[in-house]
A protein has these predicted regions:
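Extracytoplasmic/secretory soluble proteins
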Residues: 1-301
Protein backbone atom coordinates (compact mmCIF):
# COMPACT_ATOMS: atom_id res chain seq x y z
CA UNK A 1 0.00 0.00 0.00
CA UNK A 2 2.99 2.27 -0.47
CA UNK A 3 4.33 3.08 -3.93
CA UNK A 4 1.89 0.73 -5.68
CA UNK A 5 -1.16 2.52 -4.31
CA UNK A 6 0.48 5.88 -4.97
CA UNK A 7 1.04 4.88 -8.60
CA UNK A 8 -2.53 3.67 -8.84
CA UNK A 9 -3.70 7.10 -7.68
CA UNK A 10 -1.30 8.93 -9.98
CA UNK A 11 0.52 10.64 -7.11
CA UNK A 12 3.24 12.91 -8.62
CA UNK A 13 6.91 11.95 -8.39
CA UNK A 14 8.26 15.51 -8.49
CA UNK A 15 7.15 19.03 -7.65
CA UNK A 16 6.41 21.66 -10.30
CA UNK A 17 9.96 22.97 -9.90
CA UNK A 18 11.45 19.51 -10.48
CA UNK A 19 12.35 18.79 -6.88
CA UNK A 20 11.56 15.53 -5.11
CA UNK A 21 7.89 15.11 -4.14
CA UNK A 22 7.02 13.59 -0.76
CA UNK A 23 4.54 10.97 -1.98
CA UNK A 24 3.95 9.45 1.46
CA UNK A 25 2.56 12.75 2.69
CA UNK A 26 0.36 13.38 -0.37
CA UNK A 27 -3.14 14.39 0.77
CA UNK A 28 -4.89 12.30 -1.89
CA UNK A 29 -2.91 9.21 -0.88
CA UNK A 30 -3.45 9.75 2.84
CA UNK A 31 -7.18 10.20 2.21
CA UNK A 32 -7.25 6.67 0.84
CA UNK A 33 -5.26 5.32 3.79
CA UNK A 34 -7.90 6.95 6.01
CA UNK A 35 -10.58 5.20 3.96
CA UNK A 36 -8.87 1.86 4.52
CA UNK A 37 -8.69 2.68 8.22
CA UNK A 38 -12.43 3.29 8.26
CA UNK A 39 -12.98 -0.01 6.45
CA UNK A 40 -10.87 -1.76 9.08
CA UNK A 41 -12.93 -0.26 11.90
CA UNK A 42 -16.06 -1.55 10.20
CA UNK A 43 -14.67 -5.08 10.08
CA UNK A 44 -14.11 -5.10 6.32
CA UNK A 45 -10.36 -5.77 6.56
CA UNK A 46 -9.02 -8.87 8.30
CA UNK A 47 -6.01 -8.78 10.60
CA UNK A 48 -4.62 -11.68 8.57
CA UNK A 49 -3.41 -9.29 5.88
CA UNK A 50 -0.90 -7.85 8.34
CA UNK A 51 0.63 -11.24 9.15
CA UNK A 52 0.34 -13.39 6.01
CA UNK A 53 3.78 -14.20 4.65
CA UNK A 54 4.54 -15.11 1.05
CA UNK A 55 3.63 -18.78 1.44
CA UNK A 56 0.37 -18.05 3.25
CA UNK A 57 -0.51 -15.43 0.65
CA UNK A 58 0.07 -17.86 -2.23
CA UNK A 59 -1.96 -20.58 -0.53
CA UNK A 60 -4.91 -18.24 -0.05
CA UNK A 61 -4.79 -17.06 -3.65
CA UNK A 62 -4.74 -20.68 -4.82
CA UNK A 63 -7.92 -21.35 -2.86
CA UNK A 64 -9.63 -18.03 -3.55
CA UNK A 65 -9.75 -16.99 0.10
CA UNK A 66 -9.05 -13.33 -0.60
CA UNK A 67 -12.13 -11.33 -1.56
CA UNK A 68 -9.85 -8.93 -3.42
CA UNK A 69 -6.15 -8.31 -3.99
CA UNK A 70 -4.17 -5.12 -4.44
CA UNK A 71 -0.99 -5.89 -6.34
CA UNK A 72 1.45 -3.77 -8.31
CA UNK A 73 1.82 -6.20 -11.21
CA UNK A 74 1.64 -9.82 -12.34
CA UNK A 75 5.28 -11.00 -12.00
CA UNK A 76 5.45 -14.02 -9.67
CA UNK A 77 1.64 -13.97 -9.42
CA UNK A 78 0.63 -16.11 -12.38
CA UNK A 79 1.29 -19.45 -10.66
CA UNK A 80 -1.15 -19.23 -7.74
CA UNK A 81 -3.66 -17.33 -9.88
CA UNK A 82 -3.53 -20.08 -12.50
CA UNK A 83 -4.00 -22.78 -9.84
CA UNK A 84 -7.20 -21.06 -8.68
CA UNK A 85 -8.45 -20.55 -12.23
CA UNK A 86 -7.77 -24.15 -13.26
CA UNK A 87 -9.60 -25.53 -10.24
CA UNK A 88 -12.48 -23.06 -10.64
CA UNK A 89 -13.13 -22.46 -14.38
CA UNK A 90 -16.08 -20.19 -13.65
CA UNK A 91 -14.22 -18.02 -11.14
CA UNK A 92 -11.09 -15.91 -11.52
CA UNK A 93 -9.44 -12.80 -10.18
CA UNK A 94 -9.71 -9.90 -12.65
CA UNK A 95 -8.35 -6.36 -12.66
CA UNK A 96 -10.89 -3.61 -12.05
CA UNK A 97 -10.89 0.17 -11.73
CA UNK A 98 -10.44 0.26 -7.95
CA UNK A 99 -9.24 3.24 -5.87
CA UNK A 100 -9.12 6.38 -7.96
CA UNK A 101 -7.59 9.79 -7.38
CA UNK A 102 -9.84 12.28 -5.61
CA UNK A 103 -8.12 15.14 -7.44
CA UNK A 104 -8.40 13.83 -10.99
CA UNK A 105 -5.00 12.20 -11.48
CA UNK A 106 -4.85 9.26 -13.90
CA UNK A 107 -3.12 6.02 -12.84
CA UNK A 108 0.63 6.06 -13.52
CA UNK A 109 1.73 2.48 -13.00
CA UNK A 110 5.47 1.93 -12.76
CA UNK A 111 7.51 0.08 -15.36
CA UNK A 112 11.05 -1.23 -15.74
CA UNK A 113 13.67 1.46 -15.24
CA UNK A 114 16.76 2.50 -17.16
CA UNK A 115 18.94 0.26 -15.01
CA UNK A 116 16.73 -2.77 -15.59
CA UNK A 117 14.50 -4.87 -13.41
CA UNK A 118 16.68 -4.53 -10.33
CA UNK A 119 20.20 -3.63 -9.27
CA UNK A 120 22.38 -6.53 -8.12
CA UNK A 121 25.59 -6.41 -6.14
CA UNK A 122 28.40 -8.91 -5.71
CA UNK A 123 29.44 -9.00 -2.07
CA UNK A 124 33.00 -8.08 -1.13
CA UNK A 125 33.05 -11.37 0.78
CA UNK A 126 32.24 -13.40 -2.36
CA UNK A 127 34.71 -16.31 -2.59
CA UNK A 128 34.95 -16.09 -6.40
CA UNK A 129 33.83 -12.66 -7.68
CA UNK A 130 35.03 -13.42 -11.22
CA UNK A 131 32.83 -16.51 -11.40
CA UNK A 132 29.93 -14.53 -9.95
CA UNK A 133 30.39 -11.87 -12.63
CA UNK A 134 30.55 -14.54 -15.34
CA UNK A 135 27.29 -16.02 -14.04
CA UNK A 136 25.56 -12.64 -14.12
CA UNK A 137 26.93 -11.95 -17.61
CA UNK A 138 25.64 -15.31 -18.84
CA UNK A 139 22.18 -14.83 -17.34
CA UNK A 140 21.69 -11.36 -18.83
CA UNK A 141 22.77 -12.54 -22.29
CA UNK A 142 20.08 -13.44 -24.81
CA UNK A 143 20.98 -17.10 -24.53
CA UNK A 144 20.78 -17.08 -20.74
CA UNK A 145 17.59 -15.03 -20.77
CA UNK A 146 15.87 -17.37 -23.21
CA UNK A 147 17.03 -20.38 -21.20
CA UNK A 148 15.49 -18.94 -18.02
CA UNK A 149 12.28 -18.08 -19.87
CA UNK A 150 11.72 -21.12 -22.08
CA UNK A 151 14.21 -23.82 -21.13
CA UNK A 152 15.89 -26.13 -23.65
CA UNK A 153 14.79 -26.31 -27.29
CA UNK A 154 13.28 -29.68 -28.10
CA UNK A 155 12.75 -30.52 -24.44
CA UNK A 156 10.58 -27.72 -23.08
CA UNK A 157 9.88 -25.62 -26.17
CA UNK A 158 9.87 -25.67 -29.96
CA UNK A 159 10.07 -22.90 -32.54
CA UNK A 160 7.12 -22.78 -34.94
CA UNK A 161 7.02 -21.79 -38.61
CA UNK A 162 6.54 -18.14 -37.64
CA UNK A 163 9.71 -18.20 -35.58
CA UNK A 164 7.81 -18.01 -32.28
CA UNK A 165 8.73 -20.03 -29.22
CA UNK A 166 6.06 -22.48 -28.00
CA UNK A 167 6.15 -24.58 -24.87
CA UNK A 168 5.72 -28.25 -25.70
CA UNK A 169 2.16 -29.52 -25.17
CA UNK A 170 3.21 -31.52 -22.11
CA UNK A 171 4.96 -28.57 -20.47
CA UNK A 172 2.13 -26.14 -21.23
CA UNK A 173 -0.46 -28.60 -19.92
CA UNK A 174 1.48 -28.90 -16.67
CA UNK A 175 1.91 -25.11 -16.41
CA UNK A 176 -1.80 -24.42 -16.91
CA UNK A 177 -3.32 -27.28 -14.95
CA UNK A 178 -0.73 -28.42 -12.40
CA UNK A 179 1.24 -25.28 -11.71
CA UNK A 180 2.73 -26.47 -8.44
CA UNK A 181 4.30 -29.44 -10.23
CA UNK A 182 5.42 -27.16 -13.07
CA UNK A 183 7.21 -24.89 -10.60
CA UNK A 184 8.89 -27.89 -8.99
CA UNK A 185 9.97 -29.54 -12.25
CA UNK A 186 10.73 -26.59 -14.55
CA UNK A 187 10.23 -23.22 -12.85
CA UNK A 188 10.48 -21.52 -16.26
CA UNK A 189 10.10 -17.73 -16.49
CA UNK A 190 10.04 -17.39 -12.69
CA UNK A 191 13.70 -16.52 -12.02
CA UNK A 192 12.63 -13.05 -10.95
CA UNK A 193 16.12 -11.55 -10.75
CA UNK A 194 16.49 -12.12 -14.50
CA UNK A 195 12.84 -11.77 -15.52
CA UNK A 196 13.40 -9.55 -18.55
CA UNK A 197 10.09 -8.79 -20.27
CA UNK A 198 11.73 -8.47 -23.68
CA UNK A 199 11.72 -12.26 -24.04
CA UNK A 200 7.91 -12.28 -23.95
CA UNK A 201 8.07 -11.02 -27.54
CA UNK A 202 9.57 -14.35 -28.63
CA UNK A 203 6.32 -16.20 -27.94
CA UNK A 204 2.57 -15.94 -28.31
CA UNK A 205 2.00 -18.21 -25.32
CA UNK A 206 0.12 -16.59 -22.45
CA UNK A 207 -0.88 -17.50 -18.92
CA UNK A 208 -4.65 -17.26 -19.01
CA UNK A 209 -4.95 -16.13 -15.39
CA UNK A 210 -3.12 -12.86 -16.07
CA UNK A 211 -4.19 -11.96 -19.62
CA UNK A 212 -7.06 -9.70 -18.56
CA UNK A 213 -4.91 -8.02 -15.91
CA UNK A 214 -2.19 -7.20 -18.41
CA UNK A 215 -4.74 -5.88 -20.91
CA UNK A 216 -6.25 -3.70 -18.18
CA UNK A 217 -2.85 -2.14 -17.51
CA UNK A 218 -2.31 -1.10 -21.14
CA UNK A 219 -1.86 2.66 -21.41
CA UNK A 220 -1.39 3.14 -17.67
CA UNK A 221 2.41 2.75 -17.51
CA UNK A 222 4.49 5.88 -17.00
CA UNK A 223 8.29 6.09 -16.68
CA UNK A 224 9.76 7.12 -13.34
CA UNK A 225 13.33 7.37 -14.61
CA UNK A 226 14.02 10.67 -12.85
CA UNK A 227 13.62 9.12 -9.38
CA UNK A 228 15.46 5.91 -10.19
CA UNK A 229 18.35 4.95 -7.86
CA UNK A 230 18.23 8.20 -5.90
CA UNK A 231 18.60 6.67 -2.45
CA UNK A 232 21.75 7.54 -0.47
CA UNK A 233 24.81 5.43 -1.25
CA UNK A 234 25.06 2.19 0.68
CA UNK A 235 27.00 2.27 3.98
CA UNK A 236 26.57 6.04 4.31
CA UNK A 237 25.00 7.60 7.40
CA UNK A 238 22.07 8.77 5.27
CA UNK A 239 21.52 5.24 3.93
CA UNK A 240 21.32 3.86 7.46
CA UNK A 241 18.92 6.63 8.44
CA UNK A 242 16.73 5.98 5.40
CA UNK A 243 16.61 2.26 6.19
CA UNK A 244 15.33 3.08 9.68
CA UNK A 245 12.80 5.54 8.26
CA UNK A 246 11.50 3.02 5.73
CA UNK A 247 11.13 0.36 8.41
CA UNK A 248 9.30 2.84 10.60
CA UNK A 249 7.00 3.77 7.71
CA UNK A 250 6.07 0.13 7.12
CA UNK A 251 4.96 -0.27 10.71
CA UNK A 252 3.33 3.16 10.61
CA UNK A 253 1.16 2.15 7.64
CA UNK A 254 -0.13 -0.84 9.58
CA UNK A 255 -0.83 1.33 12.62
CA UNK A 256 -2.58 3.95 10.49
CA UNK A 257 -4.96 1.39 9.02
CA UNK A 258 -5.62 -0.14 12.45
CA UNK A 259 -6.05 3.21 14.20
CA UNK A 260 -9.13 3.48 16.43
CA UNK A 261 -10.26 6.88 15.16
CA UNK A 262 -9.13 9.96 13.23
CA UNK A 263 -7.36 11.41 16.25
CA UNK A 264 -5.30 8.25 16.67
CA UNK A 265 -4.57 8.27 12.93
CA UNK A 266 -3.24 11.82 13.11
CA UNK A 267 -1.13 11.01 16.17
CA UNK A 268 0.49 7.99 14.50
CA UNK A 269 1.26 10.01 11.37
CA UNK A 270 2.76 12.84 13.43
CA UNK A 271 5.01 10.35 15.23
CA UNK A 272 6.37 9.14 11.90
CA UNK A 273 7.03 12.68 10.68
CA UNK A 274 8.89 13.41 13.91
CA UNK A 275 10.89 10.18 13.49
CA UNK A 276 11.95 11.29 10.02
CA UNK A 277 13.07 14.68 11.26
CA UNK A 278 15.15 13.10 14.01
CA UNK A 279 16.91 10.90 11.45
CA UNK A 280 18.43 13.50 9.13
CA UNK A 281 15.44 13.67 6.80
CA UNK A 282 16.58 16.97 5.29
CA UNK A 283 19.94 15.43 4.42
CA UNK A 284 18.23 12.50 2.70
CA UNK A 285 15.97 14.79 0.67
CA UNK A 286 19.03 16.81 -0.36
CA UNK A 287 20.58 13.64 -1.77
CA UNK A 288 17.31 12.78 -3.54
CA UNK A 289 17.37 16.13 -5.33
CA UNK A 290 21.06 15.89 -6.22
CA UNK A 291 20.60 12.45 -7.75
CA UNK A 292 17.46 13.54 -9.59
CA UNK A 293 19.49 16.32 -11.19
CA UNK A 294 22.13 13.79 -12.21
CA UNK A 295 19.44 11.56 -13.71
CA UNK A 296 18.12 14.47 -15.76
CA UNK A 297 21.57 15.00 -17.22
CA UNK A 298 21.72 11.32 -18.19
CA UNK A 299 18.27 11.63 -19.78
CA UNK A 300 19.26 14.76 -21.65
CA UNK A 301 16.60 16.85 -19.92
Amino acid sequence: LGADLQNFLGVPIENADGTWYDRNMDEDYLAWIRTLSQAYREGLISDDIFSDDGTAHEDKVKTGKYACLFIGGTPQRSGPLQVWRSANPDAEYIAIDGPQSTVGNAPTLSQAGLSGWMVNYISKDCSDPIKAMETFTYLISDYGGLLCKYGVEGETYTINSDGLYELTPEVKEMKDNDNDKFKHVYRLSEFIVFGNDKYDAYSADVTESTVQMQEWGAGKLKPQFVIENISPDQCSAEARALSAINTNWNTTLTSLIRSADDAAFDAVLAEHVAFRESNNWDGIVKIYNEKMSANREKLGQ
